């Protein structure tokens, strides 16, 4: 059965894609979001759900999880004209009569216009690289923290020396029974002030050590074996939970198959966010132009322009004058 053609398909379900979908709903068009991950929200939802964000207009501060929740709630007003496809990676798209054919790893979709809001691309955690690691993943071995309270009263070991590792250690200090940070260097890569707070805290610091093995029963890790760098000293750390904070690798590997113009790993766009292919637009971190500022707030501002241009492309003969939301929603 042929999929119906949506007015606008948004590639990427992060903050910018979600707001673009909301604004498209506000303009009365049908929208499909295609997201490669298993949930909406992008990096704020996956990488820093409990870290504070301070540069969203009208919010002195809010967490990545709160930002995602608010955007999804905002979009739900137009759920009757919005379709969301999760765990789908866009491979290619081609111009066809009446729009575009979009091929993913699961299906073929049809759309009259496309807005690319995939950020820096799909991302995956950098792992320990140890045998049996995958067996413990998402049971009591984590690559990001969704809820601090889940570690209450636990012995927590954190591997890493960057901002996230240090931030999680400080955040868990008063929640967990104990927190131990294992880093391969004596010096930390995190912000100096955070490192000062860490060294003055009750967090146990083990440097320079590297993980060598994991021991456990079933799907639960019980001990992390570490070895001192350039020495034979080996320690076994008992743990209830292990957080691996080595960062995430991003990949826009499929971007190069989309036959657009690029600047490094981003898509070159016009002042109206038109790509080199008519009917296809790009916003957020996926878009490149002179003076670009890579902030969520910037992407929020780009979204309405891209949506309006997409509507002008789809319906050139329609009265497409933009009106304020106060005139559209009671």
Swiss-Prot record:
The keyword Nucleotide-binding does not apply. It catalyses: 2 reduced [2Fe-2S]-[ferredoxin] + NADP(+) + H(+) = 2 oxidized [2Fe-2S]-[ferredoxin] + NADPH. Signal peptide: none annotated. It comes from the Bacteria. GO terms for molecular function: ferredoxin-NADP+ reductase activity; flavin adenine dinucleotide binding; NADP binding. PANTHER family: THIOREDOXIN REDUCTASE 1-RELATED-RELATED. This is Ferredoxin--NADP reductase. It comes from Streptococcus pyogenes serotype M3 (strain ATCC BAA-595 / MGAS315).
């Amino acid at each position: 059965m042929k999929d119906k053609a949506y007015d606008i398909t948004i590639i990427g379900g992060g903050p910018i894609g979600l707001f673009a979908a909301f604004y498209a709903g506000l303009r009365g068009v049908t929208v499909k979001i295609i997201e490669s991950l298993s949930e909406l929200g992008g990096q704020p939802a996956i990488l820093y759900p409990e870290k504070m964000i301070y540069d969203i207009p009208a919010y002195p501060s809010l967490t990545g999880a709160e930002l995602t929740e608010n955007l999804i709630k905002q979009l739900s007003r137009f759920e009757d004209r919005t379709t969301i496809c999760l765990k789908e990676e866009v491979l290619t798209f081609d111009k066809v009569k009446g729009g575009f054919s979009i091929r993913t790893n699961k299906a073929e979709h049809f759309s009259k216009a496309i807005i690319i809001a995939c950020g820096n691309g799909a991302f995956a955690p950098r792992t320990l690289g140890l045998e049996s690691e995958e067996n413990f993943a998402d049971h009591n071995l984590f690559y990001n923290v969704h809820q601090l309270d889940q570690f209450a009263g636990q012995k927590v070991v954190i591997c890493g020396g960057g901002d996230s590792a240090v931030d999680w250690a400080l955040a868990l200090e008063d929640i967990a029974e104990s927190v131990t940070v294992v880093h391969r260097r004596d010096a930390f890569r995190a912000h100096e002030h955070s490192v000062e707070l860490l060294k003055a805290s009750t967090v146990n610091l083990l440097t320079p050590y590297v993980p060598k093995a994991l021991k456990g029963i079933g799907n639960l890790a019980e001990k992390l074996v570490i070895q001192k760098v350039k020495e034979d000293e080996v320690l076994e750390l008992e743990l209830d939970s292990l957080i691996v904070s080595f960062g995430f690798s991003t990949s826009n590997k499929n971007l190069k198959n989309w036959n657009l113009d690029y600047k490094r790993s981003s898509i070159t766009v016009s002042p109206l966010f038109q790509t080199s292919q008519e009917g296809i637009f790009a916003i957020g971190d996926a878009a490149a132009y002179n003076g670009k500022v890579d902030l969520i707030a910037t992407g929020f501002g780009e979204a309405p322009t891209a949506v309006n241009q997409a509507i002008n492309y789809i319906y050139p003969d329609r009265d497409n004058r933009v009106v304020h939301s106060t005139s559209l929603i009671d």
